[in-house]
Amino acid sequence: MAAHSEQIKNNFLNNPYAQQVFNIANGQVSALDAELNKYPILRQLEQQTKVPKAYGVIALGFSSVLLIFFNMFGLAQPISNLIGWALPAYLSILAIESPQTNDDKQWLTYWVVFGSLNLVESMGLRAVLYWVPMYFVFKTLFTIWLMLPATRGAEILYFHFLRPMVGNVKSRSQSSFGTSDPLAKETGFNPAGTTAPSSFAHEKTL
């Protein structure tokens, strides 16, 4: 019986289709490991735990998917919020400390959208779950799309949705109140479309 099982195992492993699947999987894991290697905190965790970064993230991701999908122990909401907060918070801090301004739109837009989702939850989570039972699954996938450097969904959302919408608001404010805005003197923001210099912007350009 043991010999028969071993033969089946060998036949499966030697199957060209199985080998192709293994090669694709190994390639994806290697690509994920290379991407995760960009983050010092993950490299430190790998050294401390002796668990490869890619396998740790895959295991954590799979566990999170199960907990969110089946809402085990009522953890769907906190885990979804943790996923949507932890990495973006870390990357936002890096963006603040960076002298470049390339990531500002990405993370400012992300926090606006993430905050809006949580505002909707706070006002009527039961109604949301009644109409969309898989809400936390969709929310988690959406926030992952927003945050990942490979997709930069928040930046896409800014240029294709938020920016045109704000442009319409600006044009209406110009036609109704003119271009002068006393608030711009205090905040550095002008609804007419110009932004006054601020100390924060000056620091990031130095």
Curated annotation (Swiss-Prot):
<keyword id="KW-1133">Transmembrane helix</keyword>
<feature type="region of interest" description="Disordered">
    <location>
        <begin position="177"/>
        <end position="206"/>
    </location>
</feature>
<feature type="transmembrane region" description="Helical">
    <location>
        <begin position="75"/>
        <end position="95"/>
    </location>
</feature>
<feature type="topological domain" description="Cytoplasmic">
    <location>
        <begin position="146"/>
        <end position="206"/>
    </location>
</feature>
<dbReference type="GO" id="GO:0005789">
    <property type="term" value="C:endoplasmic reticulum membrane"/>
</dbReference>
<comment type="function">
    <text>Required to generate and maintain the structure of the tubular endoplasmic reticulum network and the vacuole. Induces high curvature in membranes and causes membrane tubule formation. Involved in membrane/vesicle trafficking.</text>
</comment>
<keyword id="KW-0472">Membrane</keyword>
<keyword id="KW-0333">Golgi apparatus</keyword>
<keyword id="KW-0812">Transmembrane</keyword>
<feature type="transmembrane region" description="Helical">
    <location>
        <begin position="127"/>
        <end position="145"/>
    </location>
</feature>
<feature type="topological domain" description="Cytoplasmic">
    <location>
        <begin position="96"/>
        <end position="105"/>
    </location>
</feature>
<feature type="topological domain" description="Cytoplasmic">
    <location>
        <begin position="1"/>
        <end position="52"/>
    </location>
</feature>
<comment type="subunit">
    <text>Oligomer.</text>
</comment>
<feature type="topological domain" description="Lumenal">
    <location>
        <begin position="123"/>
        <end position="126"/>
    </location>
</feature>
<feature type="transmembrane region" description="Helical">
    <location>
        <begin position="53"/>
        <end position="72"/>
    </location>
</feature>
<dbReference type="GO" id="GO:0000139">
    <property type="term" value="C:Golgi membrane"/>
</dbReference>
<protein>
    <recommendedName>
        <fullName>Protein YOP1</fullName>
    </recommendedName>
</protein>
<comment type="similarity">
    <text>Belongs to the DP1 family.</text>
</comment>
<feature type="topological domain" description="Lumenal">
    <location>
        <begin position="73"/>
        <end position="74"/>
    </location>
</feature>
<feature type="transmembrane region" description="Helical">
    <location>
        <begin position="106"/>
        <end position="122"/>
    </location>
</feature>
<keyword id="KW-0256">Endoplasmic reticulum</keyword>
<dbReference type="Pfam" id="PF03134">
    <property type="entry name" value="TB2_DP1_HVA22"/>
</dbReference>
<dbReference type="InterPro" id="IPR004345">
    <property type="entry name" value="TB2_DP1_HVA22"/>
</dbReference>
